[in-house]
Amino acid sequence: MEKEKLVALLNKDLADEHAATLRYLVHGWLEGEDTPLGASLLSRAREEMWHMHWLGMIIGQLGGEPNLTPAGYPYDPTSRTTIFKSYVEYEEKLIPHYNAEADAVENPHIKRVLQREAWESAIHARKFQRIGGKLSAEQAAGLPGGERELPQDFLDRLQKEVASKNREMLQHVRNAWVFQKDALIAWQLMDQAMGKMKQLAHFAEDVAENGITPTFEPGGIEKITALETALVKAREDVSAARQRHLELREDQESQKHAGLVTNLDLTLQQEDYESAELGDLAKAKS
């Protein structure tokens, strides 16, 4: 298979895995991370992130540009029963899809990755089928989500932080894949991306606890071609985020919620660390 055609194929798969990651994350947050359903869904989402990572690494190795705009995820939102049925159907469709792609490629590593995507999708389908079958009558007929407590304008502010932190994270992930020949720096960027995922989750959980679906705005990922430029831009982004979070921590509404303030304190300390690390990495590359 020609390289350009292979990159296009893998990028489509990447978009599909991205869609699954977001769907299971959002559903897990709406259920609540401390509930059995929520914890199970977040576990599936983490596995989908690995699926994204395997594909993104290959795309980067091939010299391609990763597509970080998620595809759509079709599901029936009528009830938990219909939602989980949709999940089973989605994962089952991926099994023959990935197996067919594996048959079409010659590279042994890429073939194995696609085969693994297929059999892990089969496991996901079985797990979702099992969850759906164990729902109580009340759970089966109901929908996830809590009652709204926070003011709408404050929720809107948190939603913007979800979208902003998501862009920061995806930019780091993209850069780690594209610049993977600089192995140590690429790993440090991926390490920071994992931290940004935790920061994103803090905001998203607060939104979801109010019965609101966390939203992710696609796009905004820069196709930077020089690693030094990527590091400088990353430090600028984290500095801007830190300033917003300092202001958010002092907001009167934030001060009413000790858990939110604690998470912001952690995020601010992490952002100080990230900024210092990025500064040193940029100096080393200059």
Residue positions per predicted region:
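Iron-associated oxidoreductase/ferritin-like identity signal
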Residues: M1-S286
